[in-house]
């Protein structure tokens, strides 16, 4: 689901500003890598067992830690309902 979320966001932004879409996609990648390297760096999520990363003021990445694996569950616009 997270990949579909991310793709939808990037495609939408790219319609008006391809450079901004690329920059945001790189930021999504960097935040996901930070979560992989330091899984507890970001705040506890609203759903038990999840954590949340604010990516710019408008986007949130929700992930969970299972053992040594960090799984990004969703990438949402801040205005979207979660959970």
What are these regions (language model features)?
Residues 1-23:
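Arg/Lys-rich, positively charged N-terminal/basic patches that mediate binding to nucleic acids
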């Amino acid at each position: 689901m997270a990949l579909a979320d991310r793709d939808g966001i990037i495609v939408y932004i790219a319609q008006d500003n391809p450079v901004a879409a690329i920059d945001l996609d790189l930021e999504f990648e960097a935040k996901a890598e930070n979560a992989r390297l330091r899984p507890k760096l970001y705040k506890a999520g609203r759903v038990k067992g999840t954590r949340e990363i604010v990516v710019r003021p408008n986007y949130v990445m929700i992930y969970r830690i299972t053992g040594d694996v960090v799984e990004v569950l969703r990438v949402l616009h801040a205005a979207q309902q979660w959970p």
